[in-house]
Design a protein with these regions (language model features):
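Outer-membrane beta-barrel proteins
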Residues: 92-100, 132-149, 192-196, 265-267, ...
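Exposed, low-structure sequence patches enriched in small/polar residues
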Residues: 254, 364-667
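Short secondary-structure boundary/capping segments
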Residues: 126, 214-219, 344-347, 376-377, ...
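Short, glycine/acidic-rich beta->alpha junctions
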Residues: 70, 177-184, 188-192, 251-255, ...
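Outer-membrane beta-barrel transmembrane domain signature of Gram-negative proteins
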Residues: 129-150, 285-352, 480-540, 545
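Structural preference for beta-rich elements and adjacent junctions enriched in aromatics
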Residues: 1-319, 324-328
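Outer-envelope beta-barrel architecture signal
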Residues: 42, 85, 103-107, 150-156, ...
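Surface-exposed extracellular loop regions of Gram-negative outer-membrane beta-barrel proteins
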Residues: 149-198, 311-375, 441, 514-515, ...
Length: 667
């Protein structure tokens, strides 16, 4: 149990709104950081805003990044008083992993308060030295909790879903007949001990209820990254993290079952995962682009169908010295029915020779068996293998930061269970930056200047890109920021080398708790990848966040891109994302999402046939009631429409009704 009394000299300035869990980051909030293994490498974070809205995350001090996707089942409450606000937390020990011990526990602990006013302020019981790179090595130790009597650490989460989907072809054929499609599944999370956990799932519902944030993909040659949101993969996901992203579970699209074991014993951290996938999709990378492909099996009677594959993943990490690690990863995906397989083996290390310096290194080997469709579509040999090497040195102190990095990724390297969207290249980068910080009444609280040089060539030695960039980052009053970028590069594409120049300016501020506004402007001479020539791109991306009272939030973002070439405007693209949420309480909300994508092209300026105009419109209405992080009810409706040159208006092609209920039973 943890309680806070947060005094405030002006209670009217407290920023507190009702929101779904893990969305309180613009508010006042307070919480506790727990390094339960006392290894100064990984910690749990629990946060609560003044209205009791909760957030939780895992902080990885080795790789210096947090994971907000992790969710624990715990209770929180908060209230605003005449003196400030008060917060209480009840965190069950079964939600934490720690070393079993007959004697007292020793944990690293930090109590932190975020105090956003004219500037962002952080208050902690631990002074943090910016010249020391590690955070967890600087927090105090809490001793106690001797002779813990652990209860049965078991969660059984049954799932019930029903959907009713209508589709029709883009040629506007007849609608499919609607019908309810109920389904059931179950997740199990068993704490065998406090430091060893087994996750299992049977017939899981891995439907993604909430829409991904849209991304503009016009004049882009590489596959886009989307975050994982599914419960089975999120628990213990950080156990599989490495310097290079070799485990990207969004590639496991439609599993029928899954089994995962993760644990930590002393200096040893380990995890294994096995699953099947009813659909086999992965990234096929090249030096200048990538595509997502899905394997299919065809026969005369049923046509083409998705191919199942079996998946195995293993990870081991050994902690060394004060804050260093070495480890290994193995992944394997195979579909014997098609003669397909991809196996990856990796060794990695993160070394901290001083308090301010980090060396990260990872070597990977892959071997693939490629079925006929990969050989015909992508020119793959029957069997391929490749290597990958990544090395990076970073220095960060209170004033200076610099890095030197080198990548060497083989032409035939593939990580079909990871997110590796570029291969066949060698890359060198160096960056140096200087930061100034000011306290008191200075207009700018932080200024950073930096320069970056990088060079990329393919494995044959052909230069693909040479780039020089300069950065300016400033933070000022009203939580304002200004980020500027000026740079240029020599870029190779389709047999030609182009001189690119680019300028970018991002600005934003939050003058009151109810308003956040900003925009990014990017003006550049950049390659037109479709037609192999240089063009002028102007891109503007404004956004606004409005809060009406404590319950209603309005978020609108837009991206406008205009691309000109000799002869006129090649295309204009507009991408809008509107999300309006009424948060009844900290547990329930009603959200409306509207996403609109409009691309208009001058067909006479293209070398190949394109649509003159294409539009996509998706809408979703979603109600959610969350009892706990794992007990939740959804009900909603979504539809999708499109338009191309065949039609004069946007035409619907999908209508979906869905409902989902999950219940966390803890016997």
């Amino acid at each position: 149990y943890v309680a806070f009394i947060a005094s405030d000299p002006d209670v009217s300035q407290i920023r507190a709104f009702y929101s779904d869990r893990d969305l309180l980051w613009d508010d006042d909030f307070i919480g506790i950081v727990l390094d339960t293994f006392n290894d100064e490498r990984r910690a749990y974070e629990f946060w609560v805003n003044p209205l009791g809205v909760q957030a939780d995350s895992i902080y990885d001090d080795v790789n210096r990044r947090g994971d907000e996707s992790w969710n624990a089942i715990w209770d929180s409450a908060g209230r605003i008083t005449t003196e400030g606000y008060e917060v209480e937390m009840a965190i069950p020990l079964k939600q934490l992993r720690f070393s079993p011990s007959d004697s007292k526990q020793v944990w690293g602990v930090d109590f932190v308060r975020q105090f956003p006013r004219d500037r962002e302020n952080r208050i902690s019981n631990n002074p943090i030295d910016r010249d020391i790179l590690c955070y967890l090595c600087q927090i105090r130790k809490l001793e106690g909790l001797a002779d813990l009597q652990t209860s049965r650490n078991l969660e059984v989460i049954p799932m019930l879903t029903t959907t009713s989907v209508q589709n029709r072809s883009r040629s506007l054929g007849p609608w499919e007949k609607p019908g309810l499609d109920p389904d059931a599944g179950v997740d199990v999370r068993w704490g065998i001990t406090q430091d060893l956990y087994l996750n299992a799932t049977l017939n899981p519902d891995f439907s993604q209820v909430e829409a991904d944030a849209p991304q503009l993909d016009i004049n882009n040659t590489f596959s886009l990254f989307f975050p994982e949101r599914r419960t089975f993969f999120l628990d213990g996901a950080d156990y599989f993290d490495t310097f290079q992203n070799l485990v990207y579970t969004r590639n496991i699209a439609d599993p029928d079952y899954g089994l995962k074991l993760t644990g930590k014993s002393g200096r040893h951290t380990y995890g294994v995962l096995t699953a099947n996938d009813l659909s086999t999709s992965f990234i096929m990378p090249r030096s200048l682009g990538s595509n997502v492909t899905t394997l299919t099996l065809s026969n005369q009677d049923s046509g083409s169908r998705a191919v199942e594959s079996d998946i195995s993943i293993a990870r081991y990490r050994l902690d060394l010295f004060d804050n260093s690690t070495i480890g290994a990863v193995f992944t394997d995906r195979r579909a014997d029915a098609l003669g397909y397989s991809n196996s990856v083996a990796s060794i990695d290390a993160v070394l901290r020779p001083t308090n301010s310096d980090t060396v990260s290194i990872q070597g990977v080997y892959s071997r693939s068996e490629n079925p006929v469709q990969l050989r015909e579509r992508f020119g793959q040999a029957n069997e391929t293998s490749g290597n990958s090497l990544r090395v990076q040195y970073n220095h960060i102190d209170a004033e200076w930061d610099w890095r030197i990095g080198y990548d060497d990724i083989g032409k035939d390297f593939r990580a079909d269970l990871g997110f590796v969207n570029r291969v066949d290249y060698k890359y060198f980068v160096t960056t140096v930056g200087r930061t100034w910080r000011a306290d008191g009444d200075s207009f700018f609280s932080r200024i950073r200047l930096a320069a970056d040089y990088d060079r990329t060539e393919d494995q044959s030695g052909k230069e693909l890109e040479e780039e020089l960039e300069f950065f300016l980052n400033m933070n000022g009053p009203a939580q304002s920021y200004l980020n500027a970028l000026v740079g240029g590069s020599k870029t190779y594409w389709n047999g030609k080398t182009f001189d690119e120049q680019y300028n970018q300016l991002s600005m934003g501020f939050s003058p009151t708790a109810n308003l956040g506004i900003g925009a990014t402007l990017r003006i550049e001479d950049v390659v037109d990848f479709t037609n192999t020539r240089l063009g002028r791109s102007n891109r503007l991306g404004p956004f606004i966040r409005l809060q009406f009272g404590r319950h209603l939030q309005f978020n609108l973002s837009h991206t406008l891109q205009q691309f000109d070439v000799d002869g006129g405007r090649l295309f204009t693209a507009n991408l809008s994302d509107l999300r309006t949420t009424y948060q009844f309480t900290a547990k329930s909300f009603l959200r409306f999402t509207l996403q609109y994508n409009d691309r208009e092209r001058d067909q006479s300026l293209y070398l190949s046939s394109v649509q003159r105009r294409s539009k996509d419109l998706t809408a979703q209405l979603l109600y959610s009631y969350r009892f706990t992080a794992a007990t939740r009810f959804f009900i909603g409706y979504s539809d999708a429409s499109f338009q191309d040159d065949r039609f004069d208006s946007i035409e619907p092609i999908n209508r979906s009704f869905f409902a989902k209920f999950t219940y966390a039973w803890q016997p």
